[in-house]
Amino acid sequence: MITLFLSPSCTSCRKARAWLSKHEVAFEEHNIITSPLNKEELLQILSFTENGTEDIISTRSKVFQKLAIDVDELSTSSLMELISENPSLLRRPIILDKKRMQIGFNEDEIRAFLPRDYRKQELKQATIRAEIEGKHD
């Protein structure tokens, strides 16, 4: 099952939700503002990152700049507490399943969450369209 970690006021989060719904992809929504990440969720997210906290912390956020801290120096429990108290520190949306994670909304990258059969069918249709258009040139 896909989990969409979001904040309702975030434009990219709304785009991700709309895209998943439009493509009939089942997902569970988790509002990180009203229900901050627990330790297991944070550890799971971190396990998918290539650059650790650098991938998930929004360094451009007002909260981050106001705190003026080096998150790499924090222990896991301190980081957990900091994110729990300041959920807007996280880049959003975070889209996660058992095999992959995407941070932010990117229409090309989010396609990885479509079932393989769906992607094959779309590729087949695109190929047919390209062949038809090629005959008209």
UniProtKB/Swiss-Prot annotation:
HAMAP family to which the protein is assigned, alphabetical: Spx
Gene3D superfamilies documented for this protein: Glutaredoxin
Assembly description: Interacts with the C-terminal domain of the alpha subunit of the RNAP.
Gene name per UniProt: spx
Organism of provenance: Streptococcus agalactiae serotype V (strain ATCC BAA-611 / 2603 V/R)
Protein purpose: Global transcriptional regulator that plays a key role in stress response and exerts either positive or negative regulation of genes. Acts by interacting with the C-terminal domain of the alpha subunit of the RNA polymerase (RNAP). This interaction can enhance binding of RNAP to the promoter region of target genes and stimulate their transcription, or block interaction of RNAP with activator.
Cysteine-cysteine disulfides: 10-13
Family of the protein in this entry: Belongs to the ArsC family. Spx subfamily.
Gene Ontology cellular-component annotations: cytoplasm
Signal peptide range: none
InterPro entries in alphabetical order: Arsenate_reductase-like (IPR006660), Spx (IPR023731), Thioredoxin-like_sf (IPR036249), Tscrpt_reg_Spx/MgsR (IPR006504)
Listed name of the protein: Global transcriptional regulator Spx
Top-level taxon of the source organism: Bacteria
Keywords associated with the record: Cytoplasm, Disulfide bond, Redox-active center, Transcription, Transcription regulation
SUPFAM superfamilies (UniProt xref): Thioredoxin-like
Major subcellular location class: cytoplasm
Entry's localization field: Cytoplasm
Any GO BP annotation: negative regulation of DNA-templated transcription
